[in-house]
Regions:
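ATP/nucleoside-binding phosphotransfer catalytic cores, i.e., glycine-rich phosphate-binding loops
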Residues: 135-205
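Catalytic core of DAGKc-family lipid kinases
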Residues: 1-112, 118, 165
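Short low-complexity stretches enriched in small and charged residues
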Residues: 83-92, 123-130, 150-162
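Exposed beta-strand and adjacent loop surfaces of beta-rich binding modules
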Residues: 75-77, 128, 176-178
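A short, structural micro-pattern
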Residues: 72-74, 99, 123-126, 163-165, ...
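Internal helical hairpin/lid segments
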Residues: 102-145, 151
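Short, low-complexity, polar/charged sequence segments that are solvent-exposed and flexible
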Residues: 64-66, 94-99, 109-111, 123-128, ...
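Well-ordered beta-strand positions enriched in small/hydrophobic/aromatic, beta-favoring residues
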Residues: 76-78, 131, 169
C-alpha cells in the first residue's frame, strides 16, 4: 500500500535473507531488470548509494543494513515502454539530446539526480511520478538560471516547464531521442509509455 499523508512509512528490521546490496541506482535497476525478465520475485535491495538511497535517507552503512536498526521500506518502481520495448527504473528517467537546447523530459520516482534536487516534493512510495517537461523553446539563459536553483530545490514556475504528478504518462517526441534510466543510456525512442508500479520494491536503509 502506498504511503498516506501523516502515516508512518516502513518498519525496523535487517536486510532479509536473499537481499541484494546495491551501491547505485544502475545496480538496483540491473537487479530489477534481471528478475523481471526471468519472471522471478525481485529481492529486497539494501541501498548503499545512489539517488534513491539519498531520497530515502540512506547512510551507505552496510553494518546498519544487517542490524535491527535498519528500516525496511516499500518503494514504487518506474516502468517504461520505449517504442514498445519494456524497461524499468528505480529513481529517474531522462529523455534529452542536450540539457541546454531542445526538449528535455525528466520523470522522477525519487528526488535527486546527482547533486540536483529535481523533485523536492516527490516521494518514492506515493503512487505517482513527478514529470518535468521542458519545452524546446526555453531560452539558454533561463535554463542556466534553473540549473543554479536545482542544487537547493528552490524551483520557480516557468511557462516553458510543464510539471505533473501522475501515476502514468505518455510522452511523444518528433524524432528518436536518447533515454537514460537511472543514469545509464538505454537507447533512443520516440514514444515513451511510463507508469508507476506501486510497492513493487522492498528497500532497506
Amino acid at each position: 500500500m502506498t504511503i498516506e499523508k501523516h502515516q508512518p512509512w516502513g518498519e525496523h528490521g535487517p536486510l532479509p535473507a536473499g537481499g541484494v546490496l546495491v551501491r547505485s541506482d544502475a545496480e538496483a535497476r540491473a537487479v530489477v531488470e534481471r528478475h523481471r525478465r526471468a519472471g522471478t520475485e525481485i529481492p529486497a535491495l539494501g541501498l548503499l548509494g545512489g539517488d534513491l538511497c539519498r531520497t530515502v535517507g540512506g547512510r551507505g552503512d552496510e553494518g546498519r543494513l544487517r542490524s535491527p536498526d535498519a528500516v525496511v521500506l516499500p518503494v514504487d518502481l518506474g516502468s517504461v515502454l520505449l517504442d514498445g520495448r519494456q524497461h524499468w527504473f528505480t529513481s529517474h528517467l531522462v529523455a534529452r539530446r542536450s540539457w541546454w537546447r531542445g526538449r528535455v523530459v525528466a520523470v522522477m520516482n525519487g528526488q535527486w539526480i546527482g547533486r540536483w534536487d529535481v523533485a523536492p516534493k516527490g516521494h518514492p512510495n506515493d503512487g505517482r511520478l513527478d514529470v518535468y517537461d521542458v519545452a524546446q523553446a526555453m531560452p539558454l539563459g533561463d535554463r542556466l538560471a534553473a540549473r543554479r536553483r536545482l542544487a537547493s530545490g528552490t524551483h520557480v514556475p516557468h511557462p516553458a516547464i510543464e510539471v505533473q504528478r501522475v501515476p502514468a504518462v505518455q510522452v511523444e517526441f518528433d524524432r528518436p531521442t536518447p533515454v537514460w534510466l537511472d543514469g545509464e543510456r538505454v537507447g533512443s525512442a520516440r514514444t515513451l509509455s511510463i507508469r508507476t508500479e506501486p510497492d513493487a520494491l522492498t528497500c532497506v536503509v
